[in-house]
Amino acid sequence: MQLKGKTVLITGGASGIGLESAKQFLANGASVIITGRNQEKLDEAMRLYPAITAIKSDVSDAGDAQKLFNQVQQLGGIDILYNNAGVLTDPINLGTANGQHFEDAAYEMNVNYLGVIRLNNLFMDMLKSRKESAIINTTSLLSYVPSLLEATYAASKVALQFYTKSLRKHLQILNSSVKIFELLPPLVATEMTTDMNGKKMTTADMVKAFIAGLEKDQLTIRIGDTKTVYILNRLFPKMTFGLINPKKSYKVIAS
């Protein structure tokens, strides 16, 4: 996919992977609109990269999503919708009665899954009207293997993965040219993963590999350890589960 001359909307674009993506999309000749919930972070992003357009919006809020669409439409529309926004709640034992289970799961599903569907639906006709356009949905290495510490987060990413595959096929049935990409990052060094142990890829390296996949029209973009986990889980699912869920994670859940 050609990025030069395209306009990209990045959700969760004020920090981490989203902000690094904005930087590299700009370097590849694209125009970039970012959105997020924190105005201070959006302002800082615009200070760092003055070419960025920033719009405060919460993807999990229907009213905000509609306002975002209206503003983007007034700016001339987009060619690429990059659903990057995601949230992760603290580990909690699902085997104990606790009202927090539902609240956390609902929060993660609203942002990580339902928010994506909402934006895709709002922008679909706009994207269909473009000569070359795309939707990028961000799932996870954990959409292949359950995680005890991120149980409902992983579940939200599995839901998004299945939705993404179906959306791609539905558009093919309609003979639509809108490309549907699934991005599967490994563990990346961001604010969200600060308290996580394990080898972390830098945002710069992750986004570089991501953009390389986009330019090659690689519809499923597995990066770094995600490639290894994908293959291992197909061959040795029990062993792979153990790698993702070491015994020390049991102690966290039991505490």
PLM region spans:
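Conserved glycine-rich cofactor-binding loop
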Residues: 7, 12-16
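Conserved glycine-rich Rossmann-like NAD(P)H-binding loop of the short-chain dehydrogenase/reductase
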Residues: 28-43
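The beta1-alpha1 cofactor-binding region of Rossmann-like NAD(H)/NADP(H)-dependent oxidoreductases
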Residues: 56-68
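Conserved mid-core segment of classical short-chain dehydrogenase/reductases
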Residues: 88-106, 149
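Active-site helix of classical SDR
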Residues: 120, 156
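Residue(s) in the substrate-gating loop at a strand-loop-helix junction
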Residues: 140
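C-terminal helical subdomain
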Residues: 194-230, 234
